[in-house]
Amino acid sequence: MTQANLSETLFKPRFKHPETSTLVRRFSHGAQLPVQSALDGKTIPHWYRMINRLMWIWRGIDPREILDVQARIVMSDAERTDDDLYDTVIGYRGGNWIYEWATQAMVWQQKACAEEDPQLSGRHWLHAATLYNIAAYPHLKGDDLAEQAQALSNRAYEEAAQRLPGTMRQMEFTVPGGAPITGFLHMPKGDGPFPTVLMCGGLDAMQTDYYSLYERYFAPRGIAMLTIDMPSVGFSSKWKLTQDSSLLHQHVLKALPNVPWVDHTRVAAFGFRFGANVAVRLAYLESPRLKAVACLGPVVHTLLSDFKCQQQVPEMYLDVLASRLGMHDASDEALRVELNRYSLKVQGLLGRRCPTPMLSGYWKNDPFSPEEDSRLITSSSADGKLLEIPFNPVYRNFDKGLQEITDWIEKRLC
């Protein structure tokens, strides 16, 4: 089946698809304060989704392309779930968030198919994969159209990997008590086995969102990167997120001695946002298997346990948390009680001495991850490093922060 035909088949209208903002039915807690963060983007009036320009540009999307797609959504006069929110157009048609981003992805998919140069074709496929992922954002459970966009993203990512430098292997890992999960092992040029970073991504991202991290930071230093999806999304969609948030990653870690391309004696974990919750748990529970753990903007305690902090977080992000926890129609009170159980301090881990070296990077006044969370991580480690990342200029400092984190990881792996 050709890629174009697959797109037509997946998106063929069958019934009235639920609109993304309606999937989590929480009781709203009133007016939203403006929020801006380096890793999550910012709230913009009249948009349900946070617009995450920095990360989208970092993944290779042109700023003008972002504005073009946004303009098509704004200009639509189709029916919306909420007339005040541009990105709530109902049904797979012009103006719908998923439709417009997927349409943009198909443009790059066609360019990739027409391009004879393998490297350039690979770039176009990667571009298409990223756009399909933005179409599926924020990846709420039960969002049929988003899940179809994710399927196209994975397909495009596999096509890209066949053409880009280095080697990528799709790997299946067995997890007792449930379905196996699929991960991607990205390997630099040269002979393995390679020192490897196990990526623990954020709750609103897919494992295929981190190719830039591998290509710009790890591959030039001869470090491989292994990704898996977080519980409840993508290839891990059959697993619900539980208080044992590191369950899937632990089983992957335990399987690494049987993976010939990975030097299982030189493995680090890197956690973005809630992925840091996973990575820090691994630092405590699997310290013999890890040389180091790095975190960026960690969600390990305050956001999970502090009601005041939760009130400052955008509706979309709370919807993501509720969706991952399988609490689609729970009250805010019930969600707060459940989130508290995910705090690594409440679980009795953070605050105890940990033998694994841990670094934590943070931004001042980050609404999702205050400095105290990073201090809690680094002060708990026998070899801790605290890294403050200045906010402006945001892109340059983000890159500089990642370079420093990679330096720190490399010293402990190589």
Swiss-Prot record:
Its EC number is 3.1.1.1. InterPro entries: AB_hydrolase_fold (IPR029058), FrsA (IPR043423), FrsA-like (IPR010520), FrsA_esterase (IPR050261). It catalyses: a carboxylic ester + H2O = an alcohol + a carboxylate + H(+). It comes from the Bacteria. The gene is frsA. Catalyzes the hydrolysis of esters. NCBIfam families: PRK05077.1. Belongs to the FrsA family. GO terms for molecular function: carboxylesterase activity. SUPFAM superfamilies: alpha/beta-Hydrolases. Keywords: Hydrolase, Serine esterase. This is Esterase FrsA. It is an enzyme of class 3 (hydrolase).
